[in-house]
UniProtKB/Swiss-Prot annotation:
It comes from the Eukaryota. Keywords: Metal-binding, tRNA processing, Zinc. PROSITE patterns: CYT_DCMP_DEAMINASES_2. GO terms for cellular component: cytoplasm; nucleus. Zn(2+) binds at residues 219, 277, 280. The gene is adat3. This is Probable inactive tRNA-specific adenosine deaminase-like protein 3. GO terms for biological process: tRNA processing. It comes from Danio rerio.
Amino acid sequence: MEPQAKRKKEMDDYDDTWEVLPVLSDEQSQDPELLPAYAAPILERRETSRLVKELSLIHPLPNLQHIKRVRPCKHKDSPHPLEVIVCLVSDVQCTDPKKVTLSHLLHTQCFNSNGLGDPFIVQIPANPPLTRPQFEKASKHWPTSFHEDKLVTFALKGQLFTAHQKTKMREYMCVAVKAAKSGRELGMDAVGAVIVDPKTEQIIAVAHDCKRGSHPLHHAVMVCIDLVACGQDGGAYNYEKYPACRFSCSNSVCDGKETGLPYICTGYDLYVTREPCVMCAMALVHSRISRVFYGASTADGAFGSRYKIHCQKDLNHRFEVFKGVMVNACEDLCKE
């Protein structure tokens, strides 16, 4: 008896345990940069206010406004209750920072060091934290202020989108996966893309990779953008020989032909099975896409994996990027 052929996975075989996570800038996602500083124990709590005031005059920290000058002692059995930042290590010239005394740091006879103990070196965050994970890591070194962006916090927890929104995301990505499989049957790379109007929840364009057929630059994202342009009486190419690549005239697009359309992809979302390359990412910038959702990451990806083009401050358009939508199904496309 011949063994039964392995059945290909259908979309219903994939569970819904995936999370939609934001692709943040390096500033938002990197670990806190640390600076060495001198701290000293405050031996008498009643001297705290005076010491902080006088230290701020001798050693102001103008670029470290996020740092709290005083912290409670970490050890409950410590003989001193508080510790205070005296100055940065870089503010004092000394051949051996570990042998520095208060007289080295407080280079003035006007300072009353009563209530201040011997200095020691600590690491303090160089920049204010931008996300809660950064804040939690920074606070392990020294207390810092934090102005939380609630939307970023919800996004990092996978709580930014409602159940209905996630259901629609799955629906759109399933269409992209189906398009990718149609392209693969034609000998193309298995990559699919869908452009959606989030206001109407209607699909505007569907495309798969065509670069091995009509043109070497016809990546799935490029084809999808061009299809939207074609629907706005623009576009540069014809995709009739690829029936899975199509434009759908939504109500907003059809009405817009009479009243004037926004520039190409303004206000639209892109769903793509694989993280776009640099060329496609720049095309998304120029087409004014609103948001990008991708499934599988790639080593040379232009967003989360390597370049983070959507976060470049010198570009004249930026947009939000999310990853992880139907990640298993999208990764299987790469394997197959």
